[in-house]
Amino acid sequence: MALKIRLKRMGMKKTPFYRLVVTEATSPRDGRFVEEIGYYDPTKNPVVLNIDEEKALNWLLKGATPTETTRALLSKAGVLKKFDEARK
């Protein structure tokens, strides 16, 4: 069971809102997920990004791999830096 951290699209048409979720790699984009770890709203000014760092670190240490976009968001929030420190 390979786990990924990725974005789940929510919101209305042309006004996207995303949730950062941990899900199985084979499940659909908006399908079932294991746990929600944050949200991201690119339509607001400034952009809203809220990530539960403790949950994100826990899943990263368990082996969940973030997608490219999610990796950038985790890096922006400072979670990946803490992850690198925790691995050492």
From Swiss-Prot:
Which GO terms fall under biological process for this protein? translation
GO CC terms of this entry: cytoplasm; small ribosomal subunit
Q: Which Pfam families match?
A: Ribosomal_S16
Keyword annotations from UniProtKB, A to Z: Ribonucleoprotein, Ribosomal protein
Q: List GO molecular-function terms, semicolon-separated.
A: structural constituent of ribosome
Please list every transmembrane segment annotated in the UniProt record, as residue ranges: none
Q: Which family does it belong to?
A: Belongs to the bacterial ribosomal protein bS16 family.
NCBIfam families per UniProt: S16
Cited PANTHER family: 30S RIBOSOMAL PROTEIN S16, SMALL RIBOSOMAL SUBUNIT PROTEIN BS16M
Protein name (record)? Small ribosomal subunit protein bS16
